[in-house]
């Protein structure tokens, strides 16, 4: 993989997740740290808590060795009041794109636990992103072909 140059505004969860990706590069074809705004970055539409349409920019787009594409937005518990709406819009997007393009997509809001060494996401709709019981653990080794 090519070197990654981080912007100074990278959050701690983003830094820690990036380290996980770098440690597991044998399981990953490529990954992209998405920007936070602008038409040059990947986003999906979601309806905010104020009922207005907004753009949601996931933090990471990852292609695993087995072809799975991961769309993750790193968070810590309680860090984003819009998290549920963003997550559920991303689940909708992944379902539609998986069927339309015959892709294996996983992703969602990704919560770092255990000092940001254990990363959990829900493959289904959620009504609370602060309770991760029952969520899947993202293990890059599971996608290594």
Regions found by a protein language model. Give the residues of each.
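Electrostatic, structured charged patches in enzyme active sites and in nucleic-acid/phosphate-binding
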Residues: 1-145
């Amino acid at each position: 993989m090519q070197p990654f140059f981080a912007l100074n505004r990278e959050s701690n969860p983003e830094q820690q997740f990036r380290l996980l990706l770098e440690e597991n590069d044998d399981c990953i074809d490529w990954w992209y740290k998405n920007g936070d705004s602008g038409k040059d970055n990947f986003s999906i539409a979601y309806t905010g808590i104020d009922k207005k349409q907004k753009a949601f920019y996931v933090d990471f787009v990852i292609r695993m060795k087995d072809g799975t594409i991961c769309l993750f937005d790193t968070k810590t518990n309680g860090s984003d009041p819009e998290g549920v709406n963003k997550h559920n819009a991303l689940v909708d997007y992944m379902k539609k794109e998986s069927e339309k393009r015959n892709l294996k997509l996983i992703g969602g809001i990704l919560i770092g636990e255990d000092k940001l060494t254990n990363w959990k996401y829900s493959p289904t709709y959620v009504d609370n992103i602060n309770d991760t019981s029952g969520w899947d653990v993202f293990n890059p080794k599971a996608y290594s072909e």
